[in-house]
């Protein structure tokens, strides 16, 4: 298959192109993902390749014909144009043909990470244990949580939690090898929910390092090239260490770690302080006793409403009232055994009974139905 050369005027209202360095480079790679981006009345087509026998990915722009022709997980020879306009410059696919060259699937996978990986904001492929995927209450962003092996400056290895920023489209792309219809939300969440504590090779996540005051935070960010793969080498100390370890420290937070637990009972009381800030005092019981505590004990956590704190803002008021109703409905449904639910909390490292509520997931895993509050 060979595509015609790109027409230089196919970008609609874009400014006239000043210079095109045609076929400045040729690459061979496996197409990991393709996606469209709509921005300021322009539709952009983007393609992410894993380059032949190289431990890296690169992303290029293309056109509609590329999007129709190129098939994910196939290998292509691609020639690239460097295009410079008055306002920007970018690398675009010019010509492409399917090739039979075998991509080296044995991409180097790290079994543990170091602080330097985060400080240098490296893009890594790494062994990790999936702990959960959750969505924050009242927000549209998702997070994946993993256990990983972290090596300190002295060479000692400890299992730590790390959180990974992702949107729904990235979550779907990452699970493409395991989910038949990853764009179906229920199918996608069913995969992530049922693979808690499963080990994967996590490909193409970017390490990030931020600081606030005396605290430093290490995170991952997932992107279009991020993918999950079943580990091929399970006979090593690092793999076995992850299988049998349970982290109680989260490097993405200060002196906290994250827990997810299946609920048996739930109740919430709305509160408001003198400054008009809303919060909910939450109590819950879990199906499995937490940390070998008495399973009749009510566990406690707090949820602070992220609002403008403006008593006159009807949007704030309505959002709080809707959340109170959702909590009340969840309490009734659990008590009447009409639904199942999982709670996501942060727990203090020094006192695991001190918890803040992050998110709630209602689910019927037999019917493959999932809904985040």
Swiss-Prot record:
Intrachain S-S bonds: none
A cellular component annotation (GO) from this entry: host cell nucleus
Protein name per its UniProtKB record: Late expression factor 3
Protein purpose: Required for late and very late gene expression. Lef-3 could be a single-stranded DNA-binding protein.
InterPro entries per the UniProt record, alphabetical: Baculo_LEF-3 (IPR008415)
Top-level division of the source organism's lineage: Viruses
Lineage, uppermost ranks: Viruses, Viruses incertae sedis, Naldaviricetes, Lefavirales, Baculoviridae
Gene behind the chain: LEF-3
KW Disulfide bond (keyword) present: no
């Amino acid at each position: 298959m060979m595509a015609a050369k790109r027409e230089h005027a196919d970008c609609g209202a874009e400014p006239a192109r000043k210079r095109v360095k045609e076929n400045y480079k040729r690459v061979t790679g496996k197409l990991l993902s393709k996606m469209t981006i709509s921005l300021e009345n322009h539709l952009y087509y983007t393609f992410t390749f894993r380059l032949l026998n190289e431990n890296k990915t690169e992303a290029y722009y293309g056109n509609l014909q590329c999007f129709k022709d190129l098939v994910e997980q196939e290998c292509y020879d691609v020639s690239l144009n460097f295009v410079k306009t008055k306002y920007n410059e970018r690398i675009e696919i010019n010509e492409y043909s399917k090739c039979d060259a075998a991509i080296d699937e044995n991409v180097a996978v790290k079994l543990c990470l170091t602080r330097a990986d985060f400080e240098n904001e490296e893009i890594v492929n790494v062994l990790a244990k999936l702990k959960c995927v959750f969505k924050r209450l009242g927000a549209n962003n998702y997070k994946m949580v993993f256990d990983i092996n972290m090596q300190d400056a002295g060479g000692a290895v400890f299992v730590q939690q790390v959180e990974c920023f992702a949107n729904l489209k990235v979550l779907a792309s990452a699970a493409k090898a395991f989910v038949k219809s990853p764009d179906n939300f229920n199918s996608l969440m069913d995969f992530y929910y049922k693979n808690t504590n499963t080990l994967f090779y996590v490909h193409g996540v970017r390490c990030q390092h931020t600081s606030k005051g005396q605290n430093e935070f290490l995170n991952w960010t997932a992107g279009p090239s991020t993918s999950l793969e079943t580990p091929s080498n399970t006979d090593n100390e690092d793999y076995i260490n992850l299988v049998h370890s349970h982290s109680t420290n989260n490097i993405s937070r200060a002196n906290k770690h994250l827990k997810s637990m299946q609920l048996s009972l739930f109740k919430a009381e709305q509160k408001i302080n003198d400054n008009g800030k809303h919060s909910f005092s939450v109590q819950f019981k879990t199906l499995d006793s937490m940390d070998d505590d008495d399973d009749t004990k009510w566990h406690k956590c707090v949820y602070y409403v992220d609002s403008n704190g403006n008593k006159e803002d009807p949007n704030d008021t309505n959002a709080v009232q809707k959340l109170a109703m959702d909590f009340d409905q969840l309490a009734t449904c659990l008590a009447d055994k009409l639904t199942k639910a999982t709670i996501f909390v942060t727990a203090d490292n020094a006192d695991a009974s001190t918890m803040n509520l992050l998110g709630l997931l209602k689910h019927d895993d037999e019917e493959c139905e999932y809904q985040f509050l």
